[in-house]
């Protein structure tokens, strides 16, 4: 019965009407615009640094803002900015997200001028992987540009993070979009014509790729009108002075990404298969000890324990630092051979065989059924973290107390059946109440119809035995 319950990362994004300063120490201003401010902040419980976007209510299109929060709360990919919480008070909305310390890609491009192909490759690979994943979830970004790409330094690995999903929306394959979104240099011609699909993102990525390699855009002009006219014309060139040293494969990929007709333009999945990447992609070695630990934890992950799964997901999303996830992130990226942002049965088998020799495909099939919390047949980054994170990092008393208080919505010191149901309401609205009654029965050892902290602690310890 519990197999009916499905949930994704959005179940763990907290919406609060309490004072944000109760949980955060607000620090320096990182950026300021017409609609609000971004400030550095420290989460009091974990001491983690985060970024808080503060938006004045009177200047917001609330429908658009809530759509951005909804989209970010659904996306679980190492190269997409992570959102933690959403606050509201009388004057402002607050979006709490991860803090990226390396600055904008735009600043790096301005400072550096041009990138060698070997330097551009990891940037493009991460960008296209993020967009391939978002397109796979029927989400189009619509405003890809270097100013919306952050660099985050985690250990020795610079990571690209796609930000500003305010112009993003859900799309369907049989329905074109018409609202003009984007920035003149990077906008696709079909967006200007107001009939377009998700391939507009591929055009924008093609422009970014072009600029990385030569330092100027393919469609230039002295004014926005001139730039847009040149985009509409769609003609671009590879002047010998800058492009003579650039490989034919790079030029071929740019041509395919900047194909004028969207129906003939390459898809994100096809971009990732282009031979240019194989020339310059850095060959990463698997850390065998991390891999072994991850696979052992995956095999032990218990099926049909959705309340425990939700608790683990909440703790990982809200409380485990990026530094503590870094090794597992590298393992996920190593296993994701086609770079589409999810792990398939075949990718798990291949990685497992590299470590242990061989595994029965049926074992992997059952493993995926246990781990695949949203039931889509593949393992996303969030689901991977849920089943591989070290037990000791999850089960600290501080983490369990924080999760318990978050689930105890009315603050009466226990979790009721209605409070359990509220955890799953975003993604499993029509599940029979008997499923939740069984959950309660399994956890409620004293039979009083509610889960106290001691009972909550016990079921979590038991889950990892």
Task: Tell me what each language-model feature is.
Residues 312-313, 344-357, 380-391, 416-428, ...:
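Amphipathic regulatory helices of Ca2+-sensor modules
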Residues 123-124:
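Activation segment signature within eukaryotic-like protein kinase domains
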Residues 27-34, 38:
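Protein kinase glycine-rich loop
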Residues 91-104:
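Conserved short submotifs of the Hanks-type protein kinase catalytic core
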Residues 85-86:
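A short, aromatic-enriched beta-strand patch in the conserved N-lobe beta-sheet
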Residues 49, 54-75:
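Conserved N-lobe beta3->alphaC-helix segment of eukaryotic protein kinase catalytic domains
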Residues 201:
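Conserved catalytic-loop aspartate of Hanks-type protein kinases
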